[in-house]
């Protein structure tokens, strides 16, 4: 079954999610497949993507805390950060979440080419060890901007019931 939010994300010209859109378990981001003429306009199912070996030219990052203990641990840390920050200090909360994501995803990016090279190497290792191009978000210890943004969104959404943020609920 295709995740509705995954389909919405796939259909967007720039693969953008708004702040109101929740990323829930089952969401997956397909990268590098939209250039395939056979796939134009059609989002492949997760089962089809998982059937492809790790040597495929595309990448899929899945959000699923039930099968991704590293992601579940990161979400729990994010929730602890949320509970530890005063409601009036939302900036501190956001900064700490950003630091959590940065730390988990390979540190600050000083040179995009270096992080891309590190990501390419790590991605190849993960695909080989997992025998698939579908990578659990929590398993990514090096991340490009799309991976970091997704982890930040998942982390902040996990804290939404814990902390009000002005007119928004984080």
Language-model segments: residues:
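Hydrophobic/aromatic-rich core segments of domains that either
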Residues: 143-170
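Acidic/polar, low-complexity linker and loop regions
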Residues: 114-123, 151
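N-terminal accessory/pre-domain segments preceding catalytic cores
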Residues: 1-117, 128-140
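A short linear-motif detector with a strong N-terminal bias
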Residues: 80-81, 122-123, 161-163
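Charge-rich, low-complexity amphipathic helices
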Residues: 119, 123-128, 156
């Amino acid at each position: 079954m295709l995740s509705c939010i995954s389909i919405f994300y796939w259909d967007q010209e720039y693969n953008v999610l708004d702040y109101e859109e929740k990323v829930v378990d089952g969401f997956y981001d397909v990268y590098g497949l939209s250039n395939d003429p056979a796939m134009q306009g059609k989002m492949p199912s997760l089962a089809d993507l998982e059937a492809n070996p790790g040597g495929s030219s595309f990448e899929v990052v899945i959000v699923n805390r039930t099968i991704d203990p590293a992601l579940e641990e990161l979400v729990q840390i994010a929730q602890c950060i949320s509970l530890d920050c005063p409601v009036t200090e939302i900036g501190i909360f956001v900064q700490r979440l950003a630091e959590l994501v940065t730390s988990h995803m390979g540190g600050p990016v000083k040179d995009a080419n270096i992080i891309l090279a590190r990501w390419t190497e790590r991605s190849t290792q993960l695909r080989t060890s997992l025998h698939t191009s579908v990578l659990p978000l929590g398993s990514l210890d090096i991340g490009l901007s799309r991976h970091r943004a997704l982890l930040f969104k998942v982390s902040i959404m996990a804290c939404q019931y814990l902390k009000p943020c002005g007119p928004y609920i984080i």
